[in-house]
Amino acid sequence: MVGVVVFTQGPSVVTVHVTGFKKFHGVAENPTEKIVGNLKSFVEKKGLPKNLVLGSCTVLETAGQGALGTLYKVLESAIAERENGSSAQGQIHFGVNSGATRFALENQAVNEATFRCPDELGWKPQRVPIVPSDGAISRTRETTLPVNELTKSLRKTGYDMHFVASLLEALAVLN
């Protein structure tokens, strides 16, 4: 599944960097690993709108601390590209929720790690900041994309989607 955003104002070219996770406890084959791993070849075959460029496609370890080094490299590369004036940069992360039956688009991320089972490196945090230097667990980051409208648009094209404000809201709905 690829969602396409058409920009009517702003930069003429946007480069999007995509991340997803490898397998994790209880899920031997993570669908996001397949999506991210196959995205470049899919885009080569199907193409993208002229104002959208696929940057990096990176599959991260499903480990809180184990993923940070690779994630920082992806983000630093995007920042360097932006500072060189090559294009505007965007980040899409495909997470996974083993209890979900459909895709969810989220408009915010929370700086909190609370795992119900240990990650792939054995870490099982409870209400701990993912990135301590980014603030407390109440710290959020919100996208400027019109996520609710994107969800509606994807539903109209046949994708079984729903909108949630954050992963925490999605987990609350499932529990």
Predicted region positions:
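Active-site-adjacent mobile loop/cap segments within catalytic or ligand-binding domains
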Residues: 171-175
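N-terminal catalytic or cofactor-binding beta/alpha core of small enzyme domains
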Residues: 2-170
